């Protein structure tokens, strides 16, 4: 059986994280960057992954579009305008706010499949084990199964409505920013140096939340959890 050909476009924070996680014996993937000098640097930093020309994108089975939302449609249109057909390629939409169903309506001759990332790309790059959401798709069920198997090299894949990614990411961002505001205010009100607020925001708080989620909090943090639970029971 001929090996599937996978490519990726958009080597920013998310695309770069995916490339890194597909190293170390995992499937190699071609990547496209319009700047030849930057493409050479990406290839050097990610051994095993090969730089592609724009013409080669038409020959792939799957093409991951790790592009910003406002660049996705113009990029696809530019490929079509250049003479590429893309009819044999399954285009993987990773843009959180771009609806895959709308892409399939806008480009009926093409095949788009959603694979949305829930989380932060920096965390994916450093730790792997990403979480990806793909919406049930009976029309493209066969290629969806193949896409799920591929992304399982990078993390977990859940079949669910893709809107949950934007909803949960927005909820988490809103609560995190609110907590950051409150922490800055508490540090300031306590008369502490501003440097302490910065350290608490970039180091203490994120690691405490990570430990809470994984159940690995230390004794100091667990005592504070107990105090908070007691306060909740009293109120």
Predicted segments — roles?
Residues 1-53, 186-192:
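NAD(P)+-binding Rossmann beta1-loop-alpha1 motif at the extreme N-terminus of oxidoreductases
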Residues 48-56, 158-162:
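Short acidic-hydrophobic, aromatic-tinged amphipathic segments that line or gate anion-handling sites
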Residues 25, 45-47, 87, 106-110, ...:
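Short, structured coil segments at secondary-structure junctions
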Residues 58-60:
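Alpha-helix C-terminal capping/helix-to-coil transition sites in glycosyltransferase folds
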Residues 36-41, 99-102, 140-143:
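Short, charged/polar "capping" segments at the starts of alpha-helices
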């Amino acid at each position: 059986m001929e090996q599937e050909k996978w490519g990726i476009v958009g080597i920013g924070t998310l695309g770069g994280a995916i490339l890194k996680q597909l190293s170390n014996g995992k499937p190699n993937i071609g990547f496209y960057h319009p700047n030849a000098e930057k493409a050479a640097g990406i290839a050097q930093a990610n051994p095993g992954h090969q730089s592609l020309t724009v013409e080669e994108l038409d020959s792939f089975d799957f093409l991951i579009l790790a592009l910003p939302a406002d660049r996705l449609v113009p990029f696809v249109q530019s490929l079509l305008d250049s003479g590429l057909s893309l009819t044999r390629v399954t285009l993987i939409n990773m843009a959180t706010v771009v609806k895959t169903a709308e892409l399939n309506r806008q480009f009926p001759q093409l095949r788009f499949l959603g694979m949305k990332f829930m989380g932060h790309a920096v965390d994916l790059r450093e730790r792997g084990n990403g979480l990806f959401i793909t919406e049930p798709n009976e029309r493209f069920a066969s290629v969806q199964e193949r896409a799920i198997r591929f992304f399982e090299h990078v993390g977990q894949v859940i079949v669910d409505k893709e809107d949950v990614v934007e909803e949960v990411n927005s909820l988490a961002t809103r609560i995190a920013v609110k907590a950051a505001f409150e922490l800055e205010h508490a540090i300031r009100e306590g008369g502490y140096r501003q440097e302490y607020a910065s350290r608490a925001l970039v180091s203490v708080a994120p690691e405490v939340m990570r430990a809470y989620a994984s159940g690995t909090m230390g004794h100091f943090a667990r005592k504070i959890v107990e105090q908070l639970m007691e306060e909740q029971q009293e109120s």
